[in-house]
């Protein structure tokens, strides 16, 4: 399945939002970088999945708390309460995208350098529990 031009821009915006958010954390919770990261991330999600699916995703009954926390955190960041806003927004991100952590862990395990580390018998159960990966007993 190939991406449309809008979806390609959406991936770029989402990645840019992630980078600005990360730079905002590295610069001791710089309000402008965190806010720009939030805006770019939301625009990217909107471009990737479309307006109707974005609305449906953020208003699902099991995602409403995460959406509320994300928006309240972003609002607090704009009101110069950056650390508290970051904490609340992080809880919202976990609430919204926590279902994808298992997929991300499985993808990272297929990578050359980090894969063996995540698959190590001492580390794998901890990572599986944190990511919510269900392992069959067989």
UniProtKB/Swiss-Prot annotation:
Residues 1-8, 53-67, 134-138 are cytoplasmic. Residues 30-31, 89-112 are lumenal. Pfam families: Got1. The chain crosses the membrane at residues 9-29, 32-52, 68-88, 113-133. It is found in: Golgi apparatus membrane. InterPro entries: Got1, Vesicle_transpt_Got1/SFT2. It is a multi-pass membrane protein. Keywords: Golgi apparatus, Membrane, Protein transport, Transmembrane, Transmembrane helix, Transport. Disruption phenotype: Lack of GOT1 is lethal in a strain lacking SFT2. GO terms for cellular component: COPII-coated ER to Golgi transport vesicle; cytosol; endoplasmic reticulum; Golgi apparatus; Golgi cis cisterna; Golgi membrane. Signal peptide: none annotated. Its main location: Golgi. GO terms for biological process: endoplasmic reticulum to Golgi vesicle-mediated transport; protein transport; retrograde transport, endosome to Golgi. Nonessential protein required for the fusion of ER-derived transport vesicles with the Golgi complex. Can be replaced by SFT2. PANTHER family: CGI-141-RELATED/LIPASE CONTAINING PROTEIN, GOLGI TRANSPORT PROTEIN 1-RELATED. Belongs to the GOT1 family. This is Protein transport protein GOT1. The gene is GOT1.
